[in-house]
Amino acid sequence: MTAKVLKRKIALRIKRKRRIRGKISGVATCPRVSIFKSNRTLYVQAIDDVTATTLAAVDGRKLGIKANKEGAVTLAKEFAKALKAKKIDVAIFDRNGYLYHGVIAAFAEALRENGIKL
């Protein structure tokens, strides 16, 4: 992929991200679950937008999780444990500009299977 094409893809994702973020907001009882996907790993956090604080976060690098569907399922299990420890069972899913497909969809479905209502 050329640098020009890559820049365009990133710009389109940022545009989608801003459009989505204008419509959703999380609070302490129902935080925003934001996921970031790199080529190698995944990161996820629960954010209270009112106080601008991170309530829970899981780093895929520290767990040795790769950015594939199996890794997304494992990350969702760990993240669900972290949310349940904070007594959070409802959240708003922020796909962070990524298409709801593949790894992102696998993460969301696994989070629902582990008892977090999105």
From Swiss-Prot:
Keyword RNA-binding (UniProt): yes
Please list the disulfide bridges: none
By its UniProt entry, which Pfam families does this protein fall under? Ribosomal_L18p
What Gene3D superfamilies does this protein map onto?
Answer: 3.30.420.100
Q: Enumerate the GO terms in the molecular function aspect.
A: 5S rRNA binding; structural constituent of ribosome
Q: Which UniProt keywords apply?
A: Ribonucleoprotein, Ribosomal protein, RNA-binding, rRNA-binding
Output the CDD domains linked to this UniProt entry.
Answer: Ribosomal_L18_L5e
Q: Which InterPro entries match?
A: Ribosomal_uL18_bac-type (IPR004389), Ribosomal_uL18_bac/euk (IPR005484)
Q: Which GO terms describe its cellular component?
A: cytosolic large ribosomal subunit
GO BP: translation
The UniProt family comment states: Belongs to the universal ribosomal protein uL18 family.
What is the role of this chain?
A: This is one of the proteins that bind and probably mediate the attachment of the 5S RNA into the large ribosomal subunit, where it forms part of the central protuberance.
How it assembles, according to the record, is:
Part of the 50S ribosomal subunit; part of the 5S rRNA/L5/L18/L25 subcomplex. Contacts the 5S and 23S rRNAs.
What is the protein's name according to its record? Large ribosomal subunit protein uL18
Q: Which organism is it from?
A: Campylobacter concisus (strain 13826)
Q: What is the lineage of its organism?
A: Bacteria, Pseudomonadati, Campylobacterota, Epsilonproteobacteria, Campylobacterales
Gene name for this UniProt entry: rplR
